[in-house]
Amino acid sequence: LKSKKGRKGEESRKRLLNAAANEFAIWGFHETKVSEIVKRAGLTQPSFYLYFQSKEAIFEELINDFHSRVRKLTESLLLENGLHTEDVSKRVLSAVETVFQCLAEDKDVTKIGFFLNPEAKQMKKDLAMALKENLEAEQRLGYFHSELDMETVAECLIGMIEHLTDSFLLTGIKDPGSLAAEVVNLLIYGMLPKGSDVR
């Protein structure tokens, strides 16, 4: 059983992380001040320095947590062997929706990790490579046609997710389910009329 002091410390640290995420998302890194983070968290400035060495340290922790969460998620979304053709689009829909749900979970952290992070471009490249590996494995299982260059597909998917997150998800205009359905309809069924989609 954790001590009361240990629990309180964890709660204070979490409040600081949440407050910092909100401040960074609103003001950006350079305009955010430690004094505003502690004010928003309802704590004192000395308490901030018990948990974080600097504004840079808390910013970096938010980014690293986001990157780690998204990377683990990407790696976990590999389609299993033995799916029937009709189940592939349902599983892809579920996977894309899961990604959008993850990004919608904490919009402030998503804004920081995906857009404000100076390393965001490299992080998206890393995610695209992990996604490419998944897609190539799924291609070998016969789920997608063999002529597709999965590196291009992965880059397109990351680009779509990034832009739709910025335009619709973070603004609350569309929810994860509807965005996922639109992405999957486009990628799986294309733009030509066929009479079937994932709705």
Task: List each model region and its residues.
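Hydrophobic alpha-helical connector segments
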Residues: 61, 72-105, 157, 180
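Hydrophobic/aromatic-rich alpha-helical bundle segments in the mid-to-C-terminal region
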Residues: 110-115, 139-186, 194-199
